[in-house]
């Protein structure tokens, strides 16, 4: 995807990341509100089964988050050697979307756990995932850090400038 400016680049990246983030968040909020008003009944009633779902879904989410983090770290290291800033940013764009998709999948497991068990633990775990998401958000500062930008390239991306000077 080609961008006419760095401002447009981050504008489009943010919009896509917001959409990816808001979809599971909307589902989670809907399920949580239904649970609070008593319209959502737990599909799993036995305490032992609830514990199994809590441990299982938390472990799956942690595995997804860890895998996404390690894979993205390796991919981003590879694109640091690409000579053109535009090409690096294009790769970073797609990798950032993939990172957000992975985090959305992990948060969807928390919504699934809430739906199955009505356990408040999944609300806490969802909040932890949202905090992790905020730390992984593809901001200009994060892009500079991930891509190891220095000098003029760093200034252009960090301050969303289209030209030097």
Describe each PLM feature range:
Residues 15-23, 94-103:
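Select subsegments of transmembrane alpha-helices in polytopic membrane proteins
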Residues 35-46:
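Membrane-interface helix termini and inter-helical loops of multi-pass transporters
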Residues 126-162:
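Alpha-helical transmembrane segments and their immediate juxtamembrane interface regions
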Residues 65-88:
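Membrane-helix interface/capping segments
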Residues 11-33, 161:
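Alpha-helical transmembrane segments of integral membrane proteins, especially early/N-terminal helices
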Residues 47-65:
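Alpha-helical transmembrane segments
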Residues 102-123:
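Alpha-helical transmembrane segments and their membrane-interface junctions
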Residues 80-99, 160-163:
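Short membrane-interface loop/juxtamembrane segments of multi-pass integral membrane proteins
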